[in-house]
């Protein structure tokens, strides 16, 4: 994105805490944010474009049940509308089943 001249920031679990960059965010700044399942557990906002690559079964230290973990990850799509995009791997059986069992409003794109 930067190579294309787009003002953007890579934030979140990639080592750049969002609050450390809050003053760098302008109206036209595009944000790429990596979030963990426990960060997504109680979100009340969805991104315009959300990407989920996979669901792993190794996050049960924090989450009691596997379905709780998966639902937390999919929370990022909960508030999307028909103008938003969900990118996901439909070849992941668990992820595909979870996506298709919910009534998400966003446009779904298989990656």
Residue ranges and their predicted role:
Residues 12, 19, 70-74:
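Generic alpha-helical structural signal
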Residues 1-15:
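Walker A (P-loop) phosphate-binding motif
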Residues 14-17, 52:
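Compositionally biased, intrinsically disordered low-complexity regions
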Residues 1, 5, 22, 102:
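Active-site catalytic pocket residues across diverse enzymes, especially alpha/beta-hydrolases
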């Amino acid at each position: 994105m930067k190579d294309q001249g787009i003002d953007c920031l890579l934030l979140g679990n990639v080592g750049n805490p969002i609050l450390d960059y809050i003053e760098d965010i302008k109206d036209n700044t595009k944000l790429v944010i990596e979030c963990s399942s426990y960060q997504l557990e109680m979100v009340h906002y969805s991104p315009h474009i959300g990407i989920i690559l996979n669901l792993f079964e190794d996050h049960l230290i924090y989450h009691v049940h596997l379905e709780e973990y998966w639902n937390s990850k999919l929370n990022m799509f909960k508030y999307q509308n028909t103008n938003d995009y969900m990118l996901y791997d439909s070849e992941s059986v668990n992820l595909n089943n979870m996506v298709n069992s919910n009534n998400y409003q966003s446009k779904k794109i298989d990656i």
